C-alpha cells in the first residue's frame, strides 16, 4: 500500500478534504483519510494541489479530428453543416484511412493529457476503439447509424459484425454499443430496431443528439424550418415522411427510445416540460456548451437543466466544433452560463455523472475505496479560498497533471 497527501483531496462523493491523504493498493484506491485524520504512515507529498478523479468526456467524435481547424464557427447550424459537408468533400471516415486514425490517436492522447479518464465517443467507422484504448482511456464507442430505410446498407443487423470485431479490440476498457444519430436523420423503424438491438446487448447504453437546433424542433413539429432544404441539399430528402407533431423528447419517448441508460446530447432547445420528462425517466443530458455556440445554435440553458432535476454530464463534442478536448474549458463555460449552480454539482457532471452514464462508475468518477487510482492533480495558486470554485473557473492547462501511483 502507498500513501499520498495533498493540500486538497476532492473525492466528489463528499466535500473537499484539506490537508488530506489517500492510500493506493494494486492501482486502486484502498482508503481516503477522513477530515483531520492523520495518515497512518509516511506519505508522498504531492504539494499544493487539488487531487480529483480523472474527468469524463461523455460526448465527442474523435474520428472527425482530421478536420480540426477546418470548419469555422457559423451563424446557424445549417450553415455549419454545409461547411462540414463541403470541407469533407465527400470523404467518409474509415478504419483503414491513416489520416483519420492518426488524427484520432492524437486527439485521444490530447484528451488524456487534459485530465480525461473516461470517454463516450461517437463513431461511424468504429476506427476510434483502438485509439481510445491505446491512450489509456475507458468508456464506450457508440456506433452511430442513420437513415430512413432499414435496407439502405446501414441497417442494424448488417452492421452487427463490425461492432463485434471492434468490441474484441476494446476489451474490458472500451466497450461498443449502437446509437441513432438524431430525430431528423433516423426513421421510426430504424429507431425501433436500434432500441431492440440495445435491449438485447450486454452494454445496453446508447446516445442520441436531441434538441440541438431550433430547426430540429420546427422540422419535427410541422416539417418547416431550414431542415427540409438542407436534407434535400445533402441528398437525404424525407419523401413521404409525416412530421410527428411532437417535440424531440416527446417524439423519441413515443418510440420507446428513452430510458435511464440513454445519453441525450445537447438539449439546447428543450422546453422545461421536456427536461422534467428526462429527469423522470432517469436519462442523462450531456451538455457541450462551447460546441453549441461554435455551430450557431446558441448557449445551452445549463441552469434550467439542473433546476429540472436532470442528470447532467459534460462533453466537448468534436474538434470540428471546438478548439480542443479540454473539459476544464467546458466547466468554465458552464460556470459562466450557470452562476447559481454550486461548483460541486458542476464537478460531479464532469466526473461521477458522466462515469455512471457510460457504465464505468465502478472504476471512475469519484475518489473512493475500490475505484481505480485514475487521479489528476491540479496546481493551486496561494490565493485559492474555495477550491471547488477554482476548479470550475480558473484552471489553466499547465496546472493539470496525472498522479503517478
Provide a role label for each language-model segment.
Residues 61, 124-125, 144-148, 179-183, ...:
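Active-site beta-loop-alpha junctions enriched in small/polar residues
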Residues 50, 68-136, 158-171:
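Alpha-helical scaffold segments that flank or form the walls of functional sites
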Residues 54-65, 205-214:
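Histidine-centered catalytic micro-motifs
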Residues 356, 372-405:
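C-terminal cap of metal-dependent C-N hydrolases
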Residues 66-102, 140-148, 213-261, 334-341:
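Active-site gating loops and adjacent loop-to-helix segments of metal-dependent hydrolytic enzymes
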Residues 1-40:
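N-terminal metal-binding scaffold of metallo-dependent hydrolase/deaminase domains
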Residues 36-52:
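Active-site metal-binding motif and surrounding structural segment of the metallo-beta-lactamase
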Residues 1, 40, 128-134, 158-284, ...:
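Histidine/acidic residue-rich metal-binding segments in metalloenzymes
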Amino acid at each position: 500500500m502507498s500513501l499520498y497527501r495533498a493540500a486538497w483531496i476532492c473525492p466528489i462523493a463528499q466535500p473537499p478534504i484539506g490537508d488530506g491523504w489517500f492510500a493506493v493498493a494494486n492501482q486502486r484506491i484502498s482508503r481516503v483519510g477522513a477530515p483531520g485524520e492523520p495518515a497512518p504512515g509516511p506519505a508522498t507529498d504531492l504539494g499544493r494541489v487539488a487531487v480529483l478523479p480523472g474527468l469524463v468526456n461523455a460526448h465527442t467524435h474523435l474520428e472527425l479530428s482530421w478536420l480540426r481547424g477546418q470548419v469555422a464557427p457559423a451563424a446557424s447550424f445549417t450553415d455549419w453543416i454545409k461547411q462540414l459537408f463541403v470541407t469533407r468533400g465527400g470523404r467518409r471516415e474509415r478504419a483503414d484511412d491513416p489520416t483519420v486514425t492518426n488524427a484520432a490517436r492524437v486527439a485521444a492522447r490530447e484528451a488524456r493529457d487534459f485530465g480525461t479518464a473516461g470517454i463516450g465517443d461517437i463513431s461511424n467507422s468504429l476506427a476510434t476503439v483502438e485509439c481510445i484504448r491505446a491512450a489509456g482511456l475507458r468508456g464506450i464507442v457508440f456506433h452511430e447509424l442513420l437513415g430512413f430505410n432499414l435496407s439502405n446498407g446501414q441497417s442494424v443487423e448488417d452492421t452487427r459484425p463490425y461492432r463485434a470485431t471492434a468490441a474484441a479490440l476494446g476489451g474490458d476498457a472500451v466497450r461498443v454499443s449502437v446509437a441513432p444519430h438524431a430525430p431528423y436523420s433516423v426513421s421510426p423503424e430504424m429507431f425501433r430496431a436500434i432500441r431492440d438491438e440495445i435491449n438485447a446487448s450486454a452494454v445496453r447504453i446508447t446516445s442520441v443528439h436531441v434538441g440541438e437546433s431550433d430547426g430540429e424542433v420546427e422540422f419535427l413539429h410541422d416539417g418547416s424550418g431550414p431542415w427540409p432544404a438542407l436534407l434535400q441539399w445533402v441528398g437525404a430528402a424525407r419523401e413521404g415522411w409525416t412530421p410527428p407533431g411532437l417535440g424531440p423528447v416527446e417524439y423519441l419517448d413515443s418510440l420507446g427510445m428513452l430510458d435511464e441508460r440513454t445519453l441525450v446530447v445537447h438539449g439546447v432547445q428543450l422546453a422545461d416540460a421536456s427536461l422534467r420528462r428526462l429527469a423522470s425517466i432517469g436519462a442523462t443530458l450531456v451538455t457541450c456548451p462551447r460546441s453549441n455556440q461554435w455551430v450557431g445554435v446558441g448557449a445551452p440553458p445549463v441552469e434550467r437543466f439542473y433546476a429540472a432535476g436532470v442528470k447532467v454530464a459534460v462533453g466537448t463534442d468534436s474538434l470540428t466544433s471546438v478548439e480542443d478536448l479540454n473539459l476544464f474549458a467546458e466547466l468554465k463555460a458552464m460556470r459562466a452560463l450557470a452562476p447559481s449552480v454550486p461548483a460541486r454539482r458542476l464537478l460531479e457532471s464532469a466526473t461521477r455523472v458522466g462515469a455512471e452514464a457510460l457504465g464505468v462508475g465502478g472504476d471512475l468518477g469519484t475518489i473512493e475505496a475500490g475505484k481505480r487510482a485514475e487521479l489528476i492533480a491540479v496546481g493551486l495558486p496561494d490565493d485559492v479560498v474555495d477550491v471547488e470554485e477554482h476548479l470550475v473557473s480558473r484552471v489553466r492547462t499547465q496546472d493539470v497533471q496525472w498522479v503517478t501511483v
